[in-house]
Amino acid sequence: MRKEGKFIIIGRPGSGKSTCIMLLLEKLRASGTKVGGIRTPELRERGIRKGFAVEDILTGQSDIFASTDFREGPSVSKYRVSVERFESIAIPALRRALEECEVVVIDEIGKMELLSRNFLEVVRDIWESEIISVGTAPLVRIEEIEKLKSSSEVIIIERGDSERISNYLFNRISDLLRVSRSSHRPSPRGTLSFL
């Protein structure tokens, strides 16, 4: 059953999911909304993608967790993944966001991130809470993501849609926060959204 305030944006690589998230973060911060969670920006060297970092949206703390240069760890595509590095940033960032923020952002929930069972557990905790959340996920079917999608508003993004979708999400989230704040609750706990 769909829960109010949970959003998942799905799309192919390069479709603009992360760009949409960055635009949304700018809008939320400018409006005074406290937002936390994680981003997983790609790392490029001379135009070639070499890996991914994980970044705590609230504190800015980050670390590389997937790289073509790593020699150990599970493989996803051409990258080796350090689950330990990922968890050292992602788990406290998401727990902190759940406790301290009005909106949680998770960019993204994909194969590399789901190598961490602890990550999946905290994502489920966020999903079961009432906090407004926005996440991104790949277009391919992944069982764990399908379960989350069943209780979310799913938005399919195509190249060129980032601005339009970020505006839509900002307006939806602003409306939800307005209702929550007017009912004198400290924050809308329990809603997860994926972009």
From Swiss-Prot:
It is an enzyme of class 3 (hydrolase). Gene3D superfamilies: P-loop containing nucleotide triphosphate hydrolases (3.40.50.300). It catalyses: a ribonucleoside 5'-triphosphate + H2O = a ribonucleoside 5'-diphosphate + phosphate + H(+). ATP binds at residues 11-18, 103-110. Its EC number is 3.6.1.15. It comes from the Archaea. InterPro entries: AAA+_ATPase (IPR003593), Nuc-triphosphatase_THEP1 (IPR004948), P-loop_NTPase (IPR027417). Keywords: ATP-binding, Hydrolase, Nucleotide-binding. GO terms for molecular function: ATP binding; ATP hydrolysis activity. It holds the Pfam family NTPase_1. CDD domains: RecA-like_Thep1. Belongs to the THEP1 NTPase family. Has nucleotide phosphatase activity towards ATP, GTP, CTP, TTP and UTP. May hydrolyze nucleoside diphosphates with lower efficiency. This is Nucleoside-triphosphatase THEP1. It comes from Korarchaeum cryptofilum (strain OPF8). The lineage of its organism: Archaea, Thermoproteota, Candidatus Korarchaeia, Candidatus Korarchaeales, Candidatus Korarchaeaceae.
